[in-house]
Amino acid sequence: MLYNVSKGVVYSDTALQGQDGDREGMWVGAGGALAPNTSSLFPPEPPGASSNIIPVYCALLATVILGLLAYVAFKCWRSHKQRQQLAKARTVELGDPDRDQRRGDSNVFVDSPPSLEPCIPSQGPHPDLGCQLYLHIPQQQQEEVQRLLMMGEPAKGWQELAGHLGYQAEAVETMACDQMPAYTLLRNWAAQEGNRATLRVLEDALAAIGREDVVQVLSSPAESSSVV
């Protein structure tokens, strides 16, 4: 080609060489094989595009944190309210005439089945022990029931009894923080239910969780009874 004096040939060869260079730019050899060069097919990412997403992530994170804080605050407030209601229920006496009115404000703890009819204790030489109120049995008998409920497996303890008496899980967790949860459960149940808090109802709940030993303690006749 160097000895060819024809400029047209030289120019033609130069154009062909330029076309070959363009073809080689579109194909890149990798390990002996040719692969298309796609680096120039997509425009480069504009600078600062990734930095625009950071405020969005920060806003989402702040929303999640505020939601968690609000949830924790609500749980603490609800637990504190339940503790206050439980403390008020302890002070309710059996003969308080306003007990039934306050019972409507404390339904958060116990949900009594509507089918249960109030059992009125019969008077006479042979009263029906099943209709006797729990708070009317002797103090020593109550303490023995509470002691037995604190012993044994949790599935047959006071927690399971609370579920059969209509208490929700949150109320059971609140009572678990007390030093004597079995005492708190039975006293609160007796105060909330009033004339429905009979030995028959309690014995049925105890039998449902397999605590016949506690049922025997309640069924055993006492030498003397006293109103607590």
UniProtKB/Swiss-Prot annotation:
- Location(s), subcellular: Cell membrane; Nucleus
Glycan attachment points: N4, N37
Which GO BP terms sit in this record?
apoptotic process; signal transduction
One Pfam family here: TNFR_16_TM
Q: Which InterPro entries match?
A: DEATH-like_dom_sf, Death_dom, Neurotrophin_rcpt-DD, TNFR16_TM
Q: Is the keyword Iron-sulfur in the record?
A: no
Feature: compositional bias, Basic and acidic residues: 90-105
GO terms for cellular component: lamellipodium; membrane; nuclear envelope lumen; nucleus; plasma membrane
Listed under subunit, the entry gives: Interacts with NGFR. Interacts with NTRK1. Interacts with SORT1.
What name is this protein filed under? Death domain-containing membrane protein NRADD
Q: Which gene encodes it?
A: Nradd
